[in-house]
Design a protein with these regions (language model features):
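N-terminal and secondary-structure boundary signal
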Residues: 1-212
């Protein structure tokens, strides 16, 4: 397996053709796997918003006040409302908001980003990352797979890693159940998440901060 970072990508704006910019900067062949940060997919889909777009509900105000009392720092109730709007379920409200997005991803703050947002305040995740991945896949001239990645924390582990939140043209998992180990013991529960392993590998090249 070889990994290549794509150089020369411009800052993506609403409506930009991401596959065009990728193919302009790297030669692709059938079977390649393209991993794309959710940040640029969201930007191309016009998911950058301002906090003024959100009117806090009573619940958002309550969450913001609870956070402020526990963390001893303010939380904008408009951001809390954006998180509520982007979530199908709130699992934990304080000391952080752990939620399930409408497409089933479990994450903090509905994956809303406050960095690399351009002239806007926040950047929401794509509405349906797997549909986004499928749409991107169809635009490439080669038969490639597409994985959309995001950075995510892990329970009881320090630091964040890249994970897959949408994909097209590739199997998500490798099922080892029914296979045997070196001692002849049958594997009963092992299902390998290929997508997240590839996302973490790609994140080593993507980096964080000013790479968005």
């Amino acid at each position: 397996m070889e990994l290549f970072a794509i150089k020369g990508m411009p800052e993506i704006k609403p409506g930009d053709n991401i596959p065009y910019h990728i193919e302009k900067n790297i030669d692709l062949i059938d079977g390649d796997i393209i991993l794309i940060a959710s940040t640029i997919v969201s930007k191309s889909e016009g998911r950058a918003k301002n906090l003024s777009d959100f009117t806090p509900s009573e619940r958002a105000e309550s969450i913001a006040k609870s956070f402020e009392s526990l963390a001893n720092k303010p939380k904008d109730a408009r951001l809390a409302q954006a998180i509520l709007d982007e979530s199908s379920e709130i699992l934990i409200e304080t000391p952080f908001i752990l939620c399930r997005t409408h497409f089933g991803h479990i994450c903090v703050n509905a994956g809303i980003d406050r960095s690399n947002t351009g002239s806007h305040d926040i950047l929401l995740l794509p509405i349906d990352p797997s549909q986004s991945a499928l749409g991107l896949k169809k635009q490439f001239s080669s038969n490639v797979s597409v994985i959309i990645t995001d950075t995510c924390g892990r329970p009881f582990r320090y630091g964040q890693v890249g994970v897959a939140i949408g994909w097209a043209g590739i199997s998500a998992h490798r099922d080892w159940r029914g296979k045997y180990d070196l001692k002849g013991n049958e594997l009963e529960v092992t299902v390998q998440c290929i997508l997240d392993e590839l996302a973490s590998a790609a994140n080593l090249l993507m980096g964080e901060g000013d790479g968005g």
